[in-house]
Amino acid sequence: MPGWRLLAQAGARVLGCGARGLGADPGLERRKNILFFVRNLHSKSSTWWDEHLSEENLSFVKQLVSDENKTQLTSKLNPLKDEPWPLHPWEPGSFRVGLIALKLGMMPLWTKDGQKHAVTLLQVQDCHVLKYTPKEDHNGKIAALTVGGKTVSRFYKPDSRLEFYRDLGLPPKQIHKIFHVTDNAVIKPGTPLYAAHFRPGQYVDVTAKTIGKGFQGVMKRWGFKGQPASHGQTKTHRRPGAISTGDIARVWPGTKMPGRMGNQNRTVYGLKVWRVNTKHNIIYVNGSVPGHKNCLVKIKDSTLPAYKDSCKNLPFPTYFPDGDEEELPEDLFDESVWQPSEPSITFA
């Protein structure tokens, strides 16, 4: 291991050595020992609030920031009272905005005919529209809305990013995602988005970053069968075998070979929404979703041809709690889902 790495792992220690130990002239022995300070590369980087605030003041500042974030979020709860942009009806071919949600985990769910389904719970936390980009400034074909999800501390955000949020009147967000929308589905920046944006029975597409597995061989990465375990095989049990032929004298692009596995954005299409909890903003989607627990995922209306026109019965362009729609119950279920409040056995 190199010497500098050993010193870095040792932390901020004081090393003393004489001038003779440094290979200097013997006449310099009478000088005082030279001190070396090694900065620990693994230590937490300090910021202004780490250095200049006491523990008592630090807790006060964090509480003050938390209260300010709650005030900003509360001020955005009634977007229809803040002169919203004109609302337009749904038309065939319209594209709505999507949501950013937190993956909570999985649980079972039963239908009325007794079938068991595994569902993934996705919670919408402080999801807001941040920016509108007209199609002239985006790609010339379709407009875009930038959506931010999950409020985070402003202590680690640069001033340029904080200024953007100050103009919006919102706390900083952990992640931003871009959604393509048609002109009739444009929403004013600062509008909050809720889980009721989606309704039970519809189908959605979920995008997230898969769990990273590191560098893996072809058997784990691509599911290769491998080679025989005996009968003359020497150190080739898990190898891929031939990767090309001699006549072409090259390896074709896209050949399945060992490499890094996972840690890539993947989309699962056509997941059915079984249940929506409007109190805690939780969406129950069918099956598994890429990513680990507590990761942020991107949800939008399914683009599969079979479900592309299923948005006509959904809130358009999004759900407004202060709109003309009646107050929603705490739980919305698909018509085929058995509700926990119902009896499990009925007699005719």
Curated annotation (Swiss-Prot):
Keyword Mitochondrion found: yes
Biological process per Gene Ontology, one example term: translation
Keywords, alphabetical: Mitochondrion, Ribonucleoprotein, Ribosomal protein, Transit peptide
GO cellular component: mitochondrial inner membrane; mitochondrial large ribosomal subunit; mitochondrion
Main subcellular localisation: mitochondrion
UniProt subcellular location: Mitochondrion
Organelle targeting sequence: 1-40
Superkingdom in the source lineage: Eukaryota
Name of the molecule in the record: Large ribosomal subunit protein uL3m
Organism: Mus musculus
